[in-house]
Curated annotation (Swiss-Prot):
Catalytic activity, as annotated: a 3'-hydro-2'-hydroxy-beta-oxodihydrochalcone + UDP-alpha-D-glucose = a 3'-(beta-D-glucopyranosyl)-2'-hydroxy-beta-oxodihydrochalcone + UDP + H(+)
Keyword Transferase: yes
Residue segments, region UDP: 280-281
Name of protein: UDP-glycosyltransferase CGT
The keyword Metal-binding appears for this protein: no
Keywords recorded for this protein, A-Z: Glycosyltransferase, Transferase
Pfam families to which the protein is assigned, alphabetical: UDPGT
E.C. code: 2.4.1.360
Binding annotation for an anthocyanidin: H24, G383
Entry's family note: Belongs to the UDP-glycosyltransferase family.
Active-site residue numbers: H24, D120
Function as written in the Swiss-Prot or TrEMBL entry: UDP-glucose-dependent glucosyltransferase catalyzing the c-glucosylation of 2-hydroxyflavanones. Acts preferentially on the dibenzoylmethane tautomers formed in equilibrium with 2-hydroxyflavanones. No activity with naringenin or naringenin chalcone.
Binding positions (UDP-alpha-D-glucose): T143, V343, Q345, H360, W363, N364, S365, E368, D384, Q385
Amino acid sequence: MPSSGDAAGRRPHVVLIPSAGMGHLVPFGRLAVALSSGHGCDVSLVTVLPTVSTAESKHLDALFDAFPAVRRLDFELAPFDASEFPGADPFFLRFEAMRRSAPLLGPLLTGAGASALATDIALTSVVIPVAKEQGLPCHILFTASAAMLSLCAYFPTYLDANAGGGGGVGDVDIPGVYRIPKASIPQALHDPNHLFTRQFVANGRSLTSAAGILVNTFDALEPEAVAALQQGKVASGFPPVFAVGPLLPASNQAKDPQANYMEWLDAQPARSVVYVSFGSRKAISREQLRELAAGLEGSGHRFLWVVKSTVVDRDDAAELGELLDEGFLERVEKRGLVTKAWVDQEEVLKHESVALFVSHCGWNSVTEAAASGVPVLALPRFGDQRVNSGVVARAGLGVWADTWSWEGEAGVIGAEEISEKVKAAMADEALRMKAASLAEAAAKAVAGGGSSHRCLAEFARLCQGGTCRTN
């Protein structure tokens, strides 16, 4: 059993408790590897089986195979009746199932000999009380942007100040940061009775009880939000905030021997390929898929496109020919590769042939683009993605047409609009240079002595010394 860390010099044992979805699991895995390999910590990662998606299961298996120093703690959920929330998103349902099972974590943590915890924002309000009962400091790894963290921290105050107004959620002007327009607020938060809204508000109110908050960003990408959070401008009594990003992919995980996309990229000229992917979390309508296909074809550029047509990958049985217009694959076969297979996104973005990333702006995708110096054409669809797209535009990492529709709004983004934006971004040398400068800043941040490296070292030191607050 790993020993708890203390001031006598024993290695601290940090237990990481992620929630569901690749957007949450991936940064937790990267944090686990960073702490265990470079910051003198024993690390365990709590896993819940079965996972919601096949991608999650494969990711966890690869992580534990490649990094045996990261211990696996399997956690069995209490029975949960999903019929209480008819039609709810399967990942929100898993959040709720994990939240209701949180009291069962106590024996697992006792048996593991934990000295500190870091959990996901989706579980904050239910894991902090468990940690307190165990006498353990509980940090939060916030897997989205610092801008989104500031919204999460301030949103309960905003609701309290506007209670009884009857006007619903409008623009949210976050102290020390900037105004998040109504149109960029995650869709679910406009419904006070939505399952996600209840979770989001409860977790936001609990942030001040955390020992500290790690956020996967770096100063040059989000200077206003990071500074405001660290200076306590967003919410009173806020804990220390550690900007530890970009959390880098583990370098020795096995590659898929059957994948052919890297061979295809190797055959393309430098800075000629548009990489298109909308992540693992949400599907795009068939109508929008076909407009996107026509837009890519009309742009005249080479492209690698990863297509997803269902929320959960296990349900995705449709063939590419069913999803796209007849003849499309044949027309573009000499300059486009379209796949439904998993790709190593970080490997793709680092490839010299890739010049532009058409992205939903999930936060992992944004940080990977920044670390790789690849400009982004933002096409947000859901959740925090418009907030993240705003970060991309503010930082100069990419461009975003903020009038484009997203999930729940009428209309689709037309092929001609997409084509013109792709052509403009591919021709924008200033955009390319700014993205390259952000990659340099990201590399400096995570290198020894850099701001993110220092923050992660300080977090490990606090856990080692047992000085994290446990309020």
